[in-house]
Amino acid sequence: MSRRRRAVKREILPDPKFGDIVITRFMNALMYDGKKSVAEGIVYGALDVLKKRGGNQADPVRMFHEALDNVKPAVEVRSRRVGGATYQVPVEVRADRRQALAIRWIIDASRKRGEHTMEERLSNELLDAVHNRGSAVKKREDTHRMAEANKAFSHYRW
């Protein structure tokens, strides 16, 4: 067990445009070198593109949350050493980690895409995630497949 105290969760303020805390978390994860205004511009630009693509009555925040929900993993594998052998043990993912992983995977998948601007890449990745395709969704499927393949070791859970 850790001897240190549990770290206090910092309160994150909702973003100024939509009033959504998850979007702020997304911006913070996207940000490089403390350049929040750049990250803000990218996210808001991508959400504007989502609004245009989905028709004017489409709600970009709802689409964003739908994309995030489609990428969130339910289970993952963790390494566990038992008697000299290392087993990949499937474990259920906590809600806060689920969200963090989904955000990270969407950003990583966006950065690896081939479009010119980050705004385009992010909007296309979010759109793909809404339709259950794209690299981020594939990452979730692979994680679930690994957990399914190692289901036999689930009794080693901790």
Curated annotation (Swiss-Prot):
<dbReference type="Pfam" id="PF00177">
    <property type="entry name" value="Ribosomal_S7"/>
</dbReference>
<keyword id="KW-0820">tRNA-binding</keyword>
<dbReference type="InterPro" id="IPR036823">
    <property type="entry name" value="Ribosomal_uS7_dom_sf"/>
</dbReference>
<comment type="similarity">
    <text>Belongs to the universal ribosomal protein uS7 family.</text>
</comment>
<keyword id="KW-0699">rRNA-binding</keyword>
<comment type="function">
    <text>One of the primary rRNA binding proteins, it binds directly to 16S rRNA where it nucleates assembly of the head domain of the 30S subunit. Is located at the subunit interface close to the decoding center, probably blocks exit of the E-site tRNA.</text>
</comment>
<dbReference type="GO" id="GO:0006412">
    <property type="term" value="P:translation"/>
</dbReference>
<dbReference type="InterPro" id="IPR005717">
    <property type="entry name" value="Ribosomal_uS7_bac/org-type"/>
</dbReference>
<dbReference type="GO" id="GO:0019843">
    <property type="term" value="F:rRNA binding"/>
</dbReference>
<dbReference type="InterPro" id="IPR023798">
    <property type="entry name" value="Ribosomal_uS7_dom"/>
</dbReference>
<dbReference type="GO" id="GO:0015935">
    <property type="term" value="C:small ribosomal subunit"/>
</dbReference>
<keyword id="KW-0687">Ribonucleoprotein</keyword>
<keyword id="KW-0689">Ribosomal protein</keyword>
<dbReference type="GO" id="GO:0003735">
    <property type="term" value="F:structural constituent of ribosome"/>
</dbReference>
<keyword id="KW-0694">RNA-binding</keyword>
<dbReference type="InterPro" id="IPR000235">
    <property type="entry name" value="Ribosomal_uS7"/>
</dbReference>
<comment type="subunit">
    <text>Part of the 30S ribosomal subunit. Contacts proteins S9 and S11.</text>
</comment>
<dbReference type="InterPro" id="IPR020606">
    <property type="entry name" value="Ribosomal_uS7_CS"/>
</dbReference>
<dbReference type="GO" id="GO:0000049">
    <property type="term" value="F:tRNA binding"/>
</dbReference>
<protein>
    <recommendedName>
        <fullName>Small ribosomal subunit protein uS7</fullName>
    </recommendedName>
</protein>
